[in-house]
């Protein structure tokens, strides 16, 4: 994996095996099972499949690939929308590094935020879902994970 390149891919287009490997790793990490055999049986995969992929499949939150994320937003031009986004990042221990905001055009503004996720208190996926639920967040994309 020294010269590996990483991709961010929506799990909807991947074979189920990858998500099942993640589930088995989570069972092991949280001590809900005694070992690999029990974990693989619980999620319905073979041990060989688990061992084949376990070192190559991560969630965004689990990955040691990087500790900075760049998010791109399309926000409606209403009072408090950006403040609410920043609040969610802050209360989850995200450390905001940069914010770039364009002037609103047709009542929408593009915003890019880079923040450190080293100390976040929730999974990145959960934080993103929380941000997406804010009234006025019209679009959110992960541009980079470093």
Curated annotation (Swiss-Prot):
CDD domains: ACT_PheB-BS. It comes from the Bacteria. InterPro entries: ACT-like_dom_sf (IPR045865), ACT_dom (IPR002912), UPF0735_ACT_dom-cont (IPR008310). Residues 70-145 form the ACT domain. Belongs to the UPF0735 family. NCBIfam families: PRK04435.1. This is UPF0735 ACT domain-containing protein Clos_1956. It comes from Alkaliphilus oremlandii (strain OhILAs). The lineage of its organism: Bacteria, Bacillati, Bacillota, Clostridia, Peptostreptococcales.
């Amino acid at each position: 994996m020294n010269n590996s390149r990483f991709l961010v891919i929506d799990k909807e287009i991947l074979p189920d095996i990858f998500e099942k490997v993640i589930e088995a790793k989570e069972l092991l990490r949280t001590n809900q099972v005694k070992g690999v055999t029990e974990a693989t049986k619980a999620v319905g995969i073979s041990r060989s499949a688990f061992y084949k992929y376990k070192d190559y499949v991560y969630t965004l939150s689990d990955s040691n690939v990087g500790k900075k994320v760049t998010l791109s937003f399309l926000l409606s031009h209403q009072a408090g929308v950006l403040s609410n986004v920043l609040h969610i990042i802050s209360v989850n221990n995200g450390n905001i590094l940069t914010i770039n905001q364009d002037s609103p055009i047709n009542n929408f503004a593009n915003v890019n935020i880079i923040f450190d996720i080293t100390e976040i208190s929730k999974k990145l996926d959960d934080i993103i879902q929380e941000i997406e639920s804010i009234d006025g967040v019209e679009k959110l994309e992960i541009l980079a994970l470093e």
